[in-house]
Amino acid sequence: MADDIIKVNQWGKVTKLNAGGGLIMPFVQELFLLECEIAGTGFVKNMEEKAKALTAGSVVSLVREPDNKYDDLAIRIDNSDGEKLGYVPRKQNEVLARLLDGGKMLYGKVAEVEFAEYSSWVTITTKIYMKDL
């Protein structure tokens, strides 16, 4: 590590050059974008069971649904087994949809899972991140 050289390239991207081999290794950054409550959990079958399997820090996937009949900017949120948990709320999905459409890697981490005391209602709060190279 002491032989590494830190450089800024012509696009302003910081890279690390290994003086021994000259290999370019980007700094991988996890960029926090927003926090939201997953929408539509009340319409997901077996939601309570799926929610019980989640803990703070559980990673969730963001999947674009450009052909969604209710919202052409829809972003589905799936658990680690690929099962639907719900959606990014419509009022927060436009920029995220554009990033996903542009090939950016977005994902979420569960921040909190709350179960209603007298019903089967579940509130899942997730933090959305972009992995930037």
Regions found by a protein language model. Give the residues of each.
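Conserved active-site motif detector
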Residues: M1-L133
